[in-house]
Amino acid sequence: MASLGAIGLCIALVLSSYSVIGSFLGKSIKISALEESARRAVYVLLLVVFVSTVSLVTAFINRDFQVAYVAAHSNLAMPNIYTWVAFYAGNEGSLLFIALALAVLSSIAIRLAPARSRETLAYTVGILMLVETFFLAVMIFMANPFDTLPLTPSDGEGINPLLTHFGMFFHPPALMSGLIGLTIPFAFAMSSLIGKQSNDEWVDAGRTWGIISWVLLASGLLLGSWWAYTILGWGGFWFWDPVENAAFMPWLALTAFIHSIMVQKRRGMFRMWNIVLINVAFALALYGMFMNRGGPVPSVHSFGASDLGLVFLSFLAAGILIPFLIFFWRFNSLKSTQSLDSMLSREAAFLLNNLLFLGIAFVTLWGTVYPLLSKLGSGEEITVARPFYDQVNGPLMLLLILLMGIGPLIPWRQANLASIKRALLIPTMVGTVSYTHLTLPTICSV
């Protein structure tokens, strides 16, 4: 089975490379048959990656300790129920899962692409498969889950005890799928720019897949908090750990994007801003995967020491630089058809909402990387603990909660103070009565 899985990865790499070349070449020389062939290669790739996945799972079930990855993450005493968890317990298996998740999501996105996005779908396919090619190449040449040992041990090292929790069946898959799922809206956005469209064609697909990725990331974060609360014993469900932060930051940027894209769909505004937001979210997702695989800041959530850090850092740099260049190439086409009529409007509330989300993300990023910057600059590694995040992000989150209550009550285009006061009157009264009802018994008992 190990040989079958390894061969499957090689075939998948050939298919993804062909899909990248066929998509861009077919579009540039206007050969629709080549574009269609490149699209169909994605479906075949999904089948091949699935076969490789089944091969690795089967190796775990059979306790094939000749496979180095199986020997490192399972043993004879491990219950079969933890086979799925062991599958993605290390770098090699998690990379295979990410490749599978991207293949599944890409196949669905290509198949169900809205009619407005069909004109540039070849570019979308090319971008998706370019990312897939990266993960497959890393697996084959640097972290192959099907590498074998020269001598087969009688037993394996066993699964990490921290992973023997019910939440681990869903937390890592949801988180990894959410992070890699951000490639889908990113690809639709970039293909719209490359294809020199009016920049509204990608909105439907971008918003749909943005929401799907948001749900996956949110589920992963919630399940991870549950796991941390019950297993790690921190006395809480959130510790502002570097890898926790690395998953939280793209969720923040994605939340801002989902809100902002509604304004573009309804009013034709924030075109440039939405491209920036989805690029930021994608870059932060790549940063999250970098942190999990040999990132410079230690974390209890990471896969430990790895030589993949530099490779992922290079990919992260490319994932920031190339979209940045495309953005400035198409800068003039991103001007919105409408302008902000008033700062007292729902559009302005959405914009402030975006700035608060990005502010929280920036503070979190700064706190995460500051120990590394301090070590590089002064030689001293300063630990940024929970109080920093609570003190700086706390006020921003309170403002965000306040805006969440007010924003939906503000009309589109333009409002006035009188209409806002009328809209807030009943919610304020209900909130005051509810607060009094909840706190009065406590006050009276003192």
Predicted ranges, named:
Residues 437-446:
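Single conserved hydrophobic/aromatic residue that forms the stacking wall/gate
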Residues 1-406, 412-413, 417-420, 424-430, ...:
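Polytopic transmembrane helical bundles with strong interfacial aromatic enrichment
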